[in-house]
Amino acid sequence: RGSFTLSPISLTIQMGEIFAILGRTGSGKTVLLEAISGMFPGDTGSILLDGTDIRDIPPGQRKLGLVYQDYGLFPHMKVKENISYGLKMHGYSKKEQDSRAQELMEMLSISHIGDQYPGTLSGGESQRTALARALALAPQVLLLDEPFSALDPATRQSLYQELRRIHRHFGCTIIFVTHDFLEARTLAGRAAILLDGELQTVTDTARLMDGHFSAEVERFLGRNQIITAPGRKQEKRIVQ
């Protein structure tokens, strides 16, 4: 992605889990997410889905759903047309397209905006529309790039619940990018912490509040260490 380079990364994500890619802005989180999606051809390494390199699978058959940070909705299409677009490209009948779009709009509480255009939507409505479109083809893996960063707190909490419901209903793996470790802890069971293009650690999110990490990760998590005596440290943990 431009001139940004990730250091070699080895990462295993279990099917069916909710997994966070966590780090500061500019640390390479989105680049890693796009690499997982198979967006970059690459000449080294592999990205395996059920044992097959994702880059060897034709894009239309990868069983991936991707939600971009800016939602990526087609401005000239109505909400229901955005949602059914992938179905149309895969040869589904108009009846099947309409039925699936309606099902997803009802599930995500956006039936009332089906005939509206993206330019008229709130941030929460745009995010729900983007989620519905990504789910239309029943992906095995749902990839989300900073899905909650531009939303107000109430909408964010509502979408946390929606994402959990999606996970229960579809049983898909969910991988999302965030800079907020509290958000990662709220939604994900595990997180990869990425700083300056390097994978620092993979940890259970329950440990983000009080686990012991490298100095760089501790700084990212907003913690201070106070030296109290020569050769001895007393840790003062401050969560910002």
Language model features with spans:
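The feature captures the beta-strand-to-loop junction immediately N-terminal to the Walker
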Residues: 22-24
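Helix-to-loop junction immediately C-terminal to a conserved catalytic motif
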Residues: 37
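Conserved ABC ATPase signature
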Residues: 117-121, 125-127
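A short, proline-enriched helix->beta-strand linker immediately N-terminal to the Walker B motif
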Residues: 136-140
